[in-house]
Amino acid sequence: MLLAHRLSILTVAVLVTAALAGWPGNAQAAKSTECTKVGMCYCVNDDLKATIATRVERFRQIIADQRKAGKAIGYLSVPLTSTGGGNYNVNKEVAESAKAAVEKRFGADFMYVLNPATPDSDLPKGGGADYMLMWTAVLEGPDGFGDFDFAYFVGPQDFARYFGFDGNGDMVKLDQYFDKRVKSDPEFEKAVQNGLTKAAFRRYYALRASTTVSRGAHDEWNIFRMLNERRRADSKFGTGSQIPVLFEGRGVAPADAEATVSEG
């Protein structure tokens, strides 16, 4: 039912795209449907398919090299967009901080965390569907059963660590951070000029910043859920070989791990 629902929505999207392409001045890159091993289908830019394939192979090689070095491999799910008062560059720094914290906790000699905010993931002129095709292919691995030993979903405590929250006037700290950064970071200053307000920034990072409010993270959660469903149903894996899911560094309860979240 889930796949049929996805495909029906996708069919409508393809028809709408085709119709819009016929309007004057709508010179868009050609798109086509690509489906992954776990049954996720995306309407992607044909011009980016080769680039996406190259990126996927690059990430798979990184994973293989790190695993050959004896390391456990984790995937970091983190909100990166500036929706709702966030800032892309700040979120990127939080991702780097979270990756470093996880590797420090377990030991960098034995742990490697793939951070999707790496420059290697950039797709020139890529849209959401293009990025999701790339990351779905990376997450599911060559065999469609997952290429990671665990998934780490970033939560409020990961943001709190980055900002130095201590439970005493944390919104004040965000006000001070905002004022300092707008004076020292031209890109942040430009974001403010384009509409980012201190109030929205303060509310977002004090109350909302988490994979809970990230559309992409919702899709990644569902992908890992599907991978574990496939593993449970396959005799080569079984329940004992599911991919562990962590939120803010703590293991997710079985009932939660098997639950579907809203699509991004």
Question: Across the structure, where does each feature detected by a protein language model lie?
Answer:
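Bacterial N-terminal signal peptides
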Residues: 11-22
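Boundary at the C-terminal end of the N-terminal hydrophobic targeting segment
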Residues: 21-29
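Conserved catalytic or regulatory cores that recognize and/or transform ribose-phosphate-containing ligands
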Residues: 30-264
